[in-house]
């Protein structure tokens, strides 16, 4: 397992900041906290580290400016609040960073910007250019146009996608939670704090609670989801409290936080994109034999597919689901949904007879696939990743 190291030894850091840290329900923007945060960012940049910020707070800030009532907002109310709040949020970041002569660059992303390959590459190029000229990208979901059906849903997973997109080696999630516990500490006095997480296992996933406040959409569940995306690409992750001023300095000085170790063998950029897809177009449900084959680094053949769900086209990302109902892999499917259903459970030699054309022998080729769950020991998986990535 890669050991934890000081922040100053990382090359590129993505910092996600929760709404509750930036915005007070009554007072609005927490200017003093933001100024202190920007001072921390300036300190990292002085060490030659690239810094990207995924900043929540647009809806919360707009809600404060518009004096909207407490409770859940309708979609159009959230979008209006985002439209008002995003301007104020961008201005606040720009003003605070400019105190240290740092330029801020605003980037608003929608789900398609990371899920569609061409737009993904374009967004990555824009972010990399901002970093090249020394600016700090301030990134948020474009809540003014995103709907409940086509959105990230929280900035934890957005931050993880940004980290993988830009090749960051550390993702820091700042919120009102100081890390991962074995159970919600406010409900269980015997809950144990976990300082180091070597691997996100099913047991770790089960520990994730549902803590979320009115000002934010995220909780520990989404942070663990973010960790799975980030660590699979070789990026370490830290969950830490941002309640104190200068939270990055606090982490550096030993404040309590949970550190998630990166995968020992980062996958290729293309496989990173596949693994991080937030909304697979469909699902392939497979049998135990297929699970064993995939764990050995082999392709998914039609014979191992028990059923097909969803509407997808050839080349779309699909989730591969094991007999227990848990996702074990993701990949680019070789057939559209209708043809996949027709050949599911059949031998590859029968494909041409069934479909009328000689398709690929594999439903999902191993070169187009990334494992998203544990099969076998970690050392065995790392050897396979090194062979097939």
UniProtKB/Swiss-Prot annotation:
Keyword Cytoplasm belongs to the record: yes
Enzyme class: transferase
One GO term describing the cellular component: cytosol
Residues bound to ATP: 16, 175-176
Transmembrane segments: none
Domain PUA: 281-358
Pathway given in the UniProt record: Amino-acid biosynthesis; L-proline biosynthesis; L-glutamate 5-semialdehyde from L-glutamate: step 1/2
Primary location: cytoplasm
PROSITE patterns for this protein: GLUTAMATE_5_KINASE, PUA
Cited Pfam families: AA_kinase, PUA
Residues reported to bind substrate: 56, 143, 155
MF term (GO), any: RNA binding
Subcellular localization(s) per the UniProt record: Cytoplasm
Catalytic activity: L-glutamate + ATP = L-glutamyl 5-phosphate + ADP
UniProt KW Transferase keyword: yes
A GO BP annotation: L-proline biosynthetic process
EC number: 2.7.2.11
Keywords, sorted A to Z: Amino-acid biosynthesis, ATP-binding, Cytoplasm, Kinase, Nucleotide-binding, Proline biosynthesis, Transferase
Family: Belongs to the glutamate 5-kinase family.
Role description: Catalyzes the transfer of a phosphate group to glutamate to form L-glutamate 5-phosphate.
Classification via NCBIfam families: proB
Record protein name field: Glutamate 5-kinase
Species for this entry: Rhizobium johnstonii (strain DSM 114642 / LMG 32736 / 3841) (Rhizobium leguminosarum bv. viciae)
Encoding gene, per UniProt annotation: proB
């Amino acid at each position: 397992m890669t050991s934890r190291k000081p922040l100053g030894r990382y090359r590129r850091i993505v910092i996600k900041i929760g709404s509750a840290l930036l915005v007070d329900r009554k007072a609005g923007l927490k200017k003093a906290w933001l100024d202190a945060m920007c001072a921390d960012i300036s300190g990292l940049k002085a060490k030659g580290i690239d810094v990207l910020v995924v900043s929540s707070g647009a809806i919360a800030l707009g809600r404060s400016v518009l004096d909207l009532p407490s409770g859940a907002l309708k979609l159009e109310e959230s979008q209006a609040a985002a439209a008002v709040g995003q301007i104020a949020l961008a201005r606040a970041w720009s003003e605070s960073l400019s105190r240290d002569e740092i330029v801020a660059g605003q980037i608003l992303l929608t789900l398609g910007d990371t899920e569609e390959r061409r737009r993904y590459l374009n967004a990555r190029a824009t972010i990399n250019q901002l970093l090249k000229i020394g600016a700090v990208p301030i990134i948020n979901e474009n809540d003014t146009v995103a709907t409940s059906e086509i959105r990230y849903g929280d900035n934890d997973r957005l931050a993880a996608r940004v980290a993988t997109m830009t090749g960051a080696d550390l993702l820091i999630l700042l919120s009102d939670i100081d890390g991962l516990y074995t159970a919600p500490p406010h409900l269980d006095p015997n809950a144990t704090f976990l300082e180091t997480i070597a691997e996100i296992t099913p047991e770790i996933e089960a520990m994730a609670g549902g803590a979320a406040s009115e000002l934010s959409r995220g909780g520990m569940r989404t942070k663990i989801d973010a960790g799975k995306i980030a660590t699979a690409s070789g990026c370490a992750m830290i969950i830490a409290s941002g309640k104190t001023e200068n939270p990055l300095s606090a982490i550096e000085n030993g404040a309590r936080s949970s550190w998630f170790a990166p995968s020992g063998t980062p996958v290729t950029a293309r496989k990173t994109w596949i693994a991080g897809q937030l909304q697979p177009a469909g699902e392939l449900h497979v049998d135990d034999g297929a699970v064993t084959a995939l764990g050995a680094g082999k392709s998914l053949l039609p014979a191992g597919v028990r059923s097909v769900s969803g509407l997808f086209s050839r080349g779309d990302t699909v989730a591969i689901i094991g007999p227990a109902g848990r996702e074990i892999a993701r990949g680019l499917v070789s057939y559209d949904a209708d043809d996949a259903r027709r050949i599911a459970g059949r031998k590859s030699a029968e494909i041409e007879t069934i479909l009328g054309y000689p398709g690929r022998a594999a439903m999902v080729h191993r070169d187009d696939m990334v494992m998203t769950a544990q099969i076998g020991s970690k050392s065995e998986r790392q050897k396979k990743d090194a062979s097939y990535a």
